[in-house]
């Protein structure tokens, strides 16, 4: 966590490279290598490693938040998840050798988002008795706070889903299966007659907010702030174009790629794919953007071998995590 915080703050300060020049244990060197550090080609008595921070990639570590109790707190399960995460970091360093792979913890982002929301709403972070609600309401429209209530804050989720065409050539933002249409959900938000704090996990391509913004404006919803876990320079410019105030837990000026761990693991997560017939109850048609299911969009620039190793890592990690869940 300390390494992540140091690197993320350096990115916010527009640093281009990070250098490690000090004695280090094997565990520390392994941690640095999993972040993308490579040995410098210079003579040195101490370990000398550096990493290019100009176009970092982000890995969102969210398997623990995807699992439900009692598995999400089981030590054996968490050990398997941790081992899978380390393998994933190493596989990602092969995509862009020498470039920073910043691993961010979804639980840390979640708690910091909650703190920011209650501070904005002027309420304590712990439930009060009697219950006293702040004037603003929290409206998650991504995945990070879906199904969670913020202390002393009216919370209502806009349930959205990114749905890909069968050939994966395009995608649209639609209402999550079995929920009302997006305009109906937005009208429900409007009926609360409260200033709104919109919350999402990532603002980089801004696909969800681009789809929601016209509907929110049409219904006259008072958006006080767009609050996200990770904000890129592109996302900040998009919010400036939409004239929306924005804040974040992490700000990364230049973001090359982002990877959501659960979305890469088959049978644990994935992206929804549109089908002609209704899905089986309890099951949603989905796909993971890894081999052999699909060719990742970054395959041409990263090379076949790196993409193959990443896909293999995802398949093996999903097998190990699911196998541990079955045994527990």
Regions inferred by a protein language model and the residue ranges of each:
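PRPP-associated nucleotide enzymes
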Residues: 1-328
């Amino acid at each position: 966590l300390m390494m992540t915080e140091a690197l993320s703050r350096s990115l916010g300060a527009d640093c281009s490279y990070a250098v490690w020049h000090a004695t280090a244990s094997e565990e520390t060197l392994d941690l640095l290598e999993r972040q993308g550090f490579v040995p410098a080609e210079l003579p040195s008595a101490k370990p000398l490693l550096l990493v290019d921070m100009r176009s970092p990639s982000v890995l969102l570590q969210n398997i623990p938040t995807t699992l439900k109790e009692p598995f999400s707190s089981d030590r054996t399960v968490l050990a398997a998840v941790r081992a899978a995460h380390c393998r994933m970091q190493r596989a990602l360093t092969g995509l862009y050798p020498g470039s920073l792979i910043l691993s961010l913890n979804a639980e840390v982002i979640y708690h910091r988002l909650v703190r920011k929301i209650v501070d904005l709403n002027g309420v304590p972070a712990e439930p009060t008795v009697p219950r006293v609600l702040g004037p603003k309401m929290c409206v998650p429209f991504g995945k990070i706070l879906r199904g969670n209530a913020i202390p002393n804050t009216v919370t209502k989720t806009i349930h959205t889903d990114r749905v890909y065409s069968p050939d994966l050539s395009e995608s649209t933002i639609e209402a999550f299966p079995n929920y009302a249409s997006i305009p109906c959900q937005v009208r429900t938000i409007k009926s609360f007659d409260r200033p709104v704090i919109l919350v999402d996990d990532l603002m980089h391509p801004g696909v969800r907010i681009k789809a929601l913004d016209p509907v929110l404006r049409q219904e006259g919803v008072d958006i006080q702030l767009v609050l996200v876990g990770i904000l890129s320079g592109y996302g900040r410019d998009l919010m400036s174009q939409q004239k929306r105030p924005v804040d974040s837990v992490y700000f990364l000026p230049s973001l090359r790629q982002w990877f959501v761990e659960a979305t890469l693991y088959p049978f644990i997560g994935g992206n929804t794919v549109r089908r002609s017939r209704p899905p089986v109850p309890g099951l949603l048609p989905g796909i993971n953007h890894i081999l052999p299911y699909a060719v990742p969009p970054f395959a041409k620039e990263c090379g076949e071998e790196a993409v193959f190793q990443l896909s293999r890592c995802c398949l093996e990690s999903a097998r190990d995590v699911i196998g541990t869940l079955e045994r527990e």
